[in-house]
Amino acid sequence: MKKYLVGGAVRDGLLQLPVKERDWVVVGATPQEMLAQGYQHVGKDFPVFLHPDSREEYALARTERKSGQGYTGFICYASPEVTLEEDLRRRDLTINAIARDDEGNLIDPYQGQQDIRQRWLRHVSDAFGEDPLRVLRVARFAARFAHLNFRIAPETMALMQQMTDELPLLAPERVWKETERTLATRNPQVYFQVLRDCGALKALFPEVDALFGVPAPAKWHPEIDTGIHTLMTVSMAARLTDDIAVRFATLCHDVGKALTPRELWPSHHGHGPAGVKVVEALCQRLKVPNPLRDLATIVARYHDLLHGAQSLTPKTLIKLFSAIDVWRRPARLEQMILASEADARGRTGFENHAYPQGDFLRDAFRVASSVSARDVMAAGFSGAQIGEELNRRRQQALASWKRQQENSDTETIQD
């Protein structure tokens, strides 16, 4: 029995990145021998065991053979006779097919170290094409390692382009899991660009793919193309926040523009509310968690309103705050502001512009929140009157605050 460290732990160690978890492959062992040594069997479909002390995963060396469609259509064969090289051959990319033995020696039959040095994401063998989920995995690795200048090998991209027919067979949960993990990387926009380059975006995210080729007014969008703007917005969101809900919301914020009749281009009046049903359909299909869905829909509906925040009347501001439920969920306002700032700065030439609307909305919410329902009830109001009076007083507080702001600005100009 021989044990080897494999996969991401070896790869990340070679890249001098933090190693978050370690996976092992065991050659020359049977399930009975693993159990006898105290390992716990956890693999439903594969012979995977947990170490009795470290709780790290140890998998028996295995091979896989295609038996049907999709990512589940495989027959696995695990046996003490399966070699390390055979086990590594079934892996997706050469950089993930390197093993390290207990003396620190690297076993690298598919030149993964060379591809790490040259920054290539390259498939190990043609068996790569048997699992459509690998299209998403490669796109995720491209996003994860974009800051290290990794790129997809041309022959791997060509193979990915041939695999799009099986993508609709992927379970929505698997598509979302890869997407969710990608949204947490520093360059999530690369994932969606790779999916577009290989033809997978149209199959998996048709709502986003439809934005490419849809023009916006050059005055406000020098990049013109709404698809390009969307990816720029996702990129900007990743610079502004680690919150994947905000990042996902920026992906969806302009999907309504794909519904604009061509004769109205490049104007997209009302695209925000129009996009809400599109966002809801996308989220339902991919089983996106409700908190992310809810933020994405309100960002789609209201992001244009936030861009003109300073010109909103106190009445409209209170309506906006109520619509996005910030009284009960104050953190949502910050998410909305970040998504809208990413939208405003996700444009060619606007990347370093300030977004004063953000501080204006934060201050406006602070002023409105200073009026409480307790104050209204103490003044003798009850029932439905409480809500009406609360809104009136909050509008009054905002009106007074806005006048002070305007007077202060006037005095500054005169000085």
From Swiss-Prot:
Alphabetically ordered keywords of this record: ATP-binding, Hydrolase, Magnesium, Metal-binding, Multifunctional enzyme, Nickel, Nucleotide-binding, Nucleotidyltransferase, RNA repair, RNA-binding, Transferase, tRNA processing
Domain of life of the organism encoding this protein: Bacteria
Residues bound to Mg(2+): 21, 23
Co-factor requirement: Mg(2+); Ni(2+)
Residue intervals of the HD domain: 226-327
Positions bound to ATP: 8, 11, 91, 137, 140
Record: residues binding CTP: 8, 11, 91, 137, 140
Annotated cofactor note: Magnesium is required for nucleotidyltransferase activity.
GO biological process entries: RNA repair; tRNA 3'-terminal CCA addition
EC number: 2.7.7.72, 3.1.3.-, 3.1.4.-
Family: Belongs to the tRNA nucleotidyltransferase/poly(A) polymerase family. Bacterial CCA-adding enzyme type 1 subfamily.
Domain notes: Comprises two domains: an N-terminal domain containing the nucleotidyltransferase activity and a C-terminal HD domain associated with both phosphodiesterase and phosphatase activities.
UniProt cross-references to PANTHER family, sorted A to Z: MULTIFUNCTIONAL CCA PROTEIN
Record's subunit section: Monomer. Can also form homodimers and oligomers.
Note: A single active site specifically recognizes both ATP and CTP and is responsible for their addition.
Name of protein: Multifunctional CCA protein
Source species: Sodalis glossinidius (strain morsitans)
